[in-house]
């Protein structure tokens, strides 16, 4: 028997905590147990002298993955889980942009140079239906994300396609859907329509408080959008007050840069004043730009980690709960759609991509419904699917590899936008501390009712 390479031992509120990043097991130790384990438990592959430990402690820590068999190779186990998740064929995930047109004119939009007036045609819809049909009998789940452009400009097309997808799935395949929208057209009537269309989650971006948001997320005529989006959120508050309504969850992505980062605490306080935090889930999203080498516009990873902790703590104080992105650390295998087998992005002309950020850029398309696979670009998909962080020397020796698996989306890695490992480590530790600081868990720890 030996120690896991993924053990962390630390103190919290005077208590002794042991965490394993591969199993995400958490244990509280007595002072005597801590003293016996501290010299070796965080060291990799140290043989354990079971005679110095109580049998029950050895049993519990083995169950949590803190102690493992001498012959067990944790890296191989991670690689197996990673490729099993990546090549899982039980689900089909399609991100569909029914249009690249948009009622906004955001200066940073990566779709600004694409053909923004394109709208999905009947031929492409038919190609989509046939594509989904080809997976029936193979998949158990069909997941659609409506994207754009602004998808709500094509609500009738979404209704039509949803009807066809549900008919194809019938009782054989579970159907679910989500949407990313700028929120301007998301009024009460539209929200209820999306509920009927089985849209279970909606994401709306903000670029800060009113002044800064309106500067970058402006309408095509240059006017602001902040007040309208807030008014929309307020308009359907009463619907969420009725807990019997099974309405879409709403997450608010707060795009964070050097210019607007001071707005974010003010923004969640404003959302609280409007009673919007009861049914929306805001979270900070770091904006990266590979051309911003000196961090003129983007926050450094360390700055963002500090801001995120402050934001999460303030949010917890305001609401008594954690943000949607400030949760107990979870082991991951596939990072996103890029490195998942049956995950594709479809543009209005039927071109197929592996990443949202590639949409509309034909040179990155791996094929289309008319001509099939493009063998000139398919290697890009192979690069996404076959990247193995355990072959990276730094990653393979990292204690948080199971929670990170390379630390950045495949698209950004290919384009050399690499993560800060120190920031990732800080974020995971902050999230773990935030979990321990939640009222119920903290009381359990301090009352010593927290079981191994």
Per-range role (PLM):
Residues 3-28, 53-95:
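N-terminal [4Fe-4S]-dependent radical SAM core
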Residues 5, 359-452:
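Flexible mid-to-C-terminal extensions adjoining Fe-S/redox cofactors in radical SAM and related proteins
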Residues 36, 41-52:
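Short acidic, hydrophobic short linear motifs in intrinsically disordered regions
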Residues 76-192, 197-200:
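Conserved alpha-helical substructure of the radical SAM core
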Residues 113-117, 215-223, 415:
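Short glycine-enriched, charge-decorated loop/helix-capping segments at active-site entrances
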Residues 191-194, 199-210, 279-287:
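Non-cysteine beta-strand/loop elements that form the S-adenosyl-L-methionine
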Residues 211-339, 347-349, 365:
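Radical SAM enzyme [4Fe-4S]-AdoMet core and its adjacent flexible, acidic
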Residues 316-360, 391-411:
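C-terminal accessory regions of radical SAM enzymes
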């Amino acid at each position: 028997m030996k120690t896991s390479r993924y053990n962390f031992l630390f103190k919290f509120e005077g208590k002794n905590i042991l965490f394993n990043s591969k199993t995400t097991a958490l244990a509280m130790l007595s002072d005597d147990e801590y003293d016996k384990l501290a010299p070796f438990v965080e060291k990799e592959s140290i043989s354990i002298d079971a005679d110095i430990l109580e049998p029950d402690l050895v049993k519990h820590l083995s169950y949590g993955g803190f102690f493992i068999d001498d012959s067990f190779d944790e890296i191989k186990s991670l690689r197996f889980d990673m490729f099993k998740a990546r090549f899982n064929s039980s689900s089909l995930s399609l991100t569909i942009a029914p249009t690249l047109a948009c009622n906004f004119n955001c200066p940073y939009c990566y779709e600004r140079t694409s053909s923004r007036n394109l709208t999905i045609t009947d031929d492409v819809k038919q190609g989509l239906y046939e594509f989904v049909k080809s997976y029936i009998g193979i998949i158990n789940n069909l997941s659609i994300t409506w994207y754009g452009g602004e998808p709500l400009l094509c609500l009738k097309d979404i209704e039509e396609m949803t009807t066809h997808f549900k008919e194809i799935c019938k009782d054989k395949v579970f159907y679910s859907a989500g949407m990313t929208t700028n929120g301007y057209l998301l009024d009460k009537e539209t929200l209820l329509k999306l509920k009927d269309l089985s849209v279970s989650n909606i994401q709306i971006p903000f670029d800060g408080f009113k002044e800064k948001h309106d500067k970058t997320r402006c309408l095509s005529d240059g006017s602001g959008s902040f007040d309208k989006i807030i008014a929309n959120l307020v308009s359907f508050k009463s619907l969420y007050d009725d807990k019997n309504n099974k309405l879409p969850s709403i997450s608010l992505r707060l795009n964070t840069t050097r210019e607007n980062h001071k707005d974010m605490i003010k923004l969640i306080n404003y959302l609280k004043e409007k009673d919007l935090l009861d049914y929306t889930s805001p979270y900070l999203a770091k904006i990266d730009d590979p051309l911003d080498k000196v961090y003129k516009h983007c926050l450094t990873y360390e700055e963002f980690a500090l801001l995120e902790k402050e934001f999460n703590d303030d949010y917890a104080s305001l609401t008594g709960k954690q943000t949607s992105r400030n949760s107990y650390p979870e082991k991951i295998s596939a990072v996103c759609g890029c490195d998942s087998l049956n995950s594709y992005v479809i543009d209005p002309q039927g071109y197929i991509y592996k990443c949202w950020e590639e949409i509309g850029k034909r040179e990155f398309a791996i094929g289309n419904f008319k001509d099939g696979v493009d063998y000139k670009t398919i290697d890009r998909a192979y690069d996404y699917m076959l990247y193995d962080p355990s072959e990276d020397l730094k990653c393979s020796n990292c204690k948080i590899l199971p929670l990170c698996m390379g630390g950045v989306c495949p698209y950004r890695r290919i384009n050399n936008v690499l993560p800060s490992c120190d920031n990732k480590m800080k974020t995971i530790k902050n999230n773990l501390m935030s979990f321990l600081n939640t009222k119920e868990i903290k009381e359990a720890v301090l009352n010593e009712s927290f079981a191994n």
